[in-house]
Amino acid sequence: PYVKNAGARMKKYEIDRKAYSDGKLQDNDIVLFRYADVLLMLSEAKVRNGESGDNELNLVRQRVGASNRTATLENILNERLMELMWEGWRRSDLIRFNKFNKDTTGKSGDKTLFPIPYEAKELNPNLK
C-alpha cells in the first residue's frame, strides 16, 4: 500500500520491493561517501593550491569511459554535478564555489526575497 507506481524516480536509489518487512520500511543502502567524491575533493584542493588536479579528475572520468579534461574549478564543479547526482552534495558545492546565490533575475544575488502570502495581504491591507 505504501509503494506507488506513479511519478518519476531516480534509478540510483530504486525501491527494493523484496525488502519490505512491514509494508513501510525498505532495506536499500544509501551512499555516504564514495571514492569518486574523495578524488574530486583532492582535485579541487590541488587546483585551489595552484597545483594540477588533472590525474584525480580524470580517474573519475575514465571509470565511465569519458575523455580526459583539464582540472579547472568549473570542470570539477560540473563533474561533481554528474558524478554525485542525488547524493545530497549539490547545495554545499554551489555554496563552496560561490555560485549558490547567483544573480538570475537581473537583481543583486546577495539578498533573498520571499513573497508575502496572499492570505496575509488579505488580512492586513498595510502589507503591499
Where are these regions (language model features)?
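Flexible, polar/acidic helix-loop-strand segments at domain edges
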Residues: 1-34
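A generic alpha-helix propensity feature with a strong bias for hydrophobic helices
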Residues: 4, 36, 118-120
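A broad, low-specificity signal marking well-ordered, structured residues that form hydrophobic/aromatic
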Residues: 8-11, 57, 74, 92
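Intrinsically disordered, low-complexity segments enriched in polar/charged small residues
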Residues: 14-17, 39, 66, 85
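Long, intrinsically disordered, low-complexity segments
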Residues: 25, 30, 61, 68-128
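Extended, hydrophobic/aromatic-rich amphipathic alpha-helical segments that build helical scaffolds
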Residues: 29-59, 74-85
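Short, glycine- and charge-enriched coil/turn segments that flank and shape catalytic ligand pockets
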Residues: 51, 66-69
